[in-house]
Amino acid sequence: MSFVPGQENAGSRSSSGNRAGNGILKKTTWADQTERGQNNGNRGRRNQPKQTATTQPNTGSVVPHYSWFSGITQFQKGKEFQFAGGQGVPIANGIPPSEQKGYWYRHNRRSFKTPDGQQKQLLPRWYFYYLGTGPHAGASFGDSIEGVFWVANSQADTNTSADIVERDPSSHEAIPTRFAPGTVLPQGFYVEGSGRSAPASRSGSRSQSRGPNNRARSSSNQRQPASTVKPDMAEEIAALVLAKLGKDAGQPKQVTKQSAKEVRQKILNKPRQKRTPNKQCPVQQCFGKRGPNQNFGGPEMLKLGTSDPQFPILAELAPTPGAFFFGSKLELVKKNSGGVDEPTKDVYELQYSGAVRFDSTLPGFETIMKVLNENLNAYQNQAGGADVVSPKPQRKRGTKQTAQKEELDSISVAKPKSAVQRNVSRELTPEDRSLLAQILDDGVVPDGLDDSNV
């Protein structure tokens, strides 16, 4: 019994036009229509015989035979089509492992002319054929053939042909190519999808079945390729990839002083209860200094605000708007308006008090308690009372010189002695005594006179 890919029972096939045995309209793939596209406008003429591998023109515009599966298209030049051993056979319902053997056939596609007049060759597309079918039906498994890559399941017997029927595109559509888990697709290739032309296929078939009066209308609904590949698809894919990489892999946006100022001003323009402090607009700029009435926040959290890594777990304790209004004690208080020169306006405060209750079963309880203990009344542990974040100390001019002067003044330096003091130890000579006697009124110089009494 011959096997039919995609069907459990091979005997259920039908050849009734474009409908399968179950009466469902079947669509065809791009490979099917490429071969028949040349005869679309030749109604009433005798159909041309199907071209085979030996009669295929070098232009590559015709796909010989009909593969059971959608193709694999190359989109990067210089890549080699290959599968690892035991891989590469498309899977389909109804095909036992013993029949999973065959080859991938390279179809050289047509060339096209670019807007500047140059000829450009489309990269090839590969189609799978079971062993004993397709353009190389008479070849043995493993024969060295240009443009053929052999694949087989580890349980398949490659010495015999696969018992698989040829595909009739009028009865069976091409199956989307799928591989067994773990199969590595060749680099630089992608699997052609199928089914994208199903609406056009059905509308085209319906319009053709309405009679000759609708043939002109049906010409605009001709079935389109199931997988339309633009000539420059490889370039487009590369451009998209580069654009994506350029977006994601670019340098991080730098925050300048100007941008930080704009962010801060944008936050401060909001009502007080709508502000969200962050690095650009710290807590004290949003809500003021810490003190008895605003007693939460340590130095690190006051700098980072909600950007602090510990803040998200605290946010789990924050009440919802519903809990705020319905679970708190609210009081509306009218406040005095501005100064005398300011326009008169009514100012109110919605004062509230409440509590958030939690216990040790709360996820992250220990971390929450640690963060709360570090930030509650943290201003009391800082020098300067309510000023938790101490301002940057200003450098006073002349401080260094003043300190040096004070240091010099604190050092006691002995003053040099006079000439008389330096001679205290010298004995008086008789000449000195005579001279002193003349000076003194009484003319007597005591014997005990020394330089210390002079």
From Swiss-Prot:
InterPro entries linked to this entry: N_prot_C_CoV, N_prot_N_CoV, NCAP_bCoV, Nucleocap_CoV, Nucleocapsid_C, Nucleocapsid_N
Coiled coil region boundaries: none
Sites where the protein binds RNA: 109, 125, 167
Region (RNA-binding): 56-197
Positions of transmembrane segments: none
Residues recorded as bearing Phosphothreonine in the entry: 177, 429
Entry's Gene Ontology cellular component terms: host cell endoplasmic reticulum-Golgi intermediate compartment; host cell Golgi apparatus; ribonucleoprotein complex; viral nucleocapsid
GO molecular function: RNA binding
Stretches the record annotates as Dimerization: 267-384
Residue ranges constituting the CoV N CTD domain according to the UniProt record: 260-383
Statement: the UniProt record of this protein carries the keyword Lipid metabolism: no
Residues with Phosphoserine modification: 170, 194, 390, 425
Principal location class: virion
Compositional bias ranges of the Low complexity kind: 9-23, 193-212
Family that this chain belongs to: Belongs to the betacoronavirus nucleocapsid protein family.
Biological function: Packages the positive strand viral genome RNA into a helical ribonucleocapsid (RNP) and plays a fundamental role during virion assembly through its interactions with the viral genome and membrane protein M. Plays an important role in enhancing the efficiency of subgenomic viral RNA transcription as well as viral replication.
Subunit comment: Homooligomer. Both monomeric and oligomeric forms interact with RNA. Interacts with protein M. Interacts with NSP3; this interaction serves to tether the genome to the newly translated replicase-transcriptase complex at a very early stage of infection.
The protein's name: Nucleoprotein
Organism: Rat coronavirus (strain 681) (RCV-SDAV)
